[in-house]
UniProtKB/Swiss-Prot annotation:
GO molecular-function terms, A-Z: UDP-glucose 4-epimerase activity
Enzyme class: isomerase
Residues given in the record as NAD(+) binding sites: 7-38
Pfam families reported for this sequence: GDP_Man_Dehyd
UniProt name for this protein: UDP-glucose 4-epimerase
Record keywords, A-Z: Carbohydrate metabolism, Galactose metabolism, Isomerase, NAD
Cofactor(s) demanded: NAD(+)
Similarity comment text for this entry: Belongs to the NAD(P)-dependent epimerase/dehydratase family.
Binding-site residues, substrate: S133
GO CC term, one of those recorded: cytosol
Organism: Pisum sativum (Garden pea)
Catalytic activity, as annotated: UDP-alpha-D-glucose = UDP-alpha-D-galactose
Length: 350
């Protein structure tokens, strides 16, 4: 157990992965300070975190409304508290939107993060867990994806993650006292087992499971399946889906590594299950979990979508002592539990 006196700053903490990670941080005895600008999230998510952990642990949680692009917001936060490490989730993540509006992505994802590094350095907080993505592998030439593969990005969102990885490597190389872990997520799905926390995207979902979920509760008429002629077992694309609670535990493992490993430098780890599931397999699993029929519309492939992507998890298992515990069945069970209890997400209304 890590001493509970350690204080962690979590940026973008009201988002899907942020909320679930904050719950696990509190459950593991950390003091947590969170900052979010609610660009793509809501205050209700923070209230639900408090509800899930209970009143005792909630006392170890502080919230600040703020934006990383405003350095004053960060200055105030770091002047008020001494942080032992930062988990940095804040950023925009919709591929399609990034293609249409790349400047918005460069402003949010790059400027915000550069400000964060500057203020961290000024206040001598030099331990960071960074939220990267499997998008940095682009169209991988072979699978599974191993951390030392050549990196490439297929869109502006992916490029921001790639740039930010490179920035992290450059900073750590120039200032070796920094310890940075880059976590490359594959496809986070599922929800907290309580049914009180889950993914609540604004507008039409960009990811498969929230889309399936919205069809199941009647918010959308059908699921668009992009590509049904891939050279896979059922013609649909294959991805590595990982339960969000496994992902949250991966962040705890990464933090422990930062605190215990002096020579971590700047190191990347995949967080996935190491197994691929097709779109149609995920639909079938969700239908089984929910008892609902999901209407499908077969559409052409989207440009830039890879046929099959899944993680090699050997490095995270060996060096972080972390391994995904949940399978597709549990992912769909928990996703449906969240959906049926919150058909309209956190707002509770259309």
């Amino acid at each position: 157990m890590v001493a509970s006196s350690q204080k962690i700053l979590v940026t973008g903490s009201a988002g899907f992965i942020g909320t679930h990670t904050v719950v696990q941080l509190l459950n593991n005895g950390f003091n947590v300070s969170i900052i979010d600008n609610f660009d793509n999230s809501v205050m209700e998510a923070v209230e639900r975190v408090r509800e899930v952990v209970g009143s005792n642990l909630s006392q170890n949680l502080e919230f600040t409304l703020g934006d990383l692009r405003n350095k004053d917001d960060l200055e105030k936060l770091f002047s008020k508290s001494k942080f032992d490490a930062v988990i940095h989730f804040a950023g925009l993540k919709a591929v399609g939107e990034s293609v249409e509006n790349p400047r918005r992505y460069f402003d949010n994802n790059l400027v915000g993060t550069i400000n964060l590094y500057e203020v961290m350095a000024k206040h001598n907080c030099k331990k960071m867990v960074f939220s990267s993505s499997a998008t940095v592998y682009g169209q991988p030439e072979k699978i599974p994806c191993v951390e030392d593969f050549k990196l490439q990005a297929m869109n502006p969102y992916g490029r921001t993650k790639l740039f930010l990885e490179e920035i992290a490597r450059d900073i750590q190389k120039a200032e070796p006292e920094w310890r940075i872990v880059l976590l490359r997520y594959f496809n986070p799905v599922g929800a907290h087992e309580s049914g009180k926390l889950g993914e609540d995207p604004r507008g039409i979902p960009n990811n498969l499971m929230p889309y399936i979920q919205q069809v199941a509760v009647g918010r959308l008429p059908e699921l668009n399946v992009y590509g049904h002629d891939y050279p896979t077992r059922d013609g649909s694309a294959i991805r590595d889906y990982i339960h969000v609670m496994d992902l949250a535990d991966g962040h705890i493992a990464a933090l422990r590594k930062l605190f215990t490993s002096e020579n971590i430098g700047c190191t990347a780890y995949n967080l996935g299950t190491g197994r691929g599931s097709s779109v149609l397999e995920m639909v079938a699993a969700f239908e089984k979990a929910s008892g609902k029929k999901i209407a499908l519309k077969l559409c052409p492939r989207r440009p830039g979508d890879a046929t099959e992507v899944y993680a090699s998890t050997a490095k995270a298992e060996k060096e972080l002592g972390w391994k995904a515990k949940y399978g597709v069945e549990e992912m769909c069970r928990d996703q449906w539990n969240w959906a049926k209890n919150n058909p309209w997400g956190y707002s509770g209304k259309p």
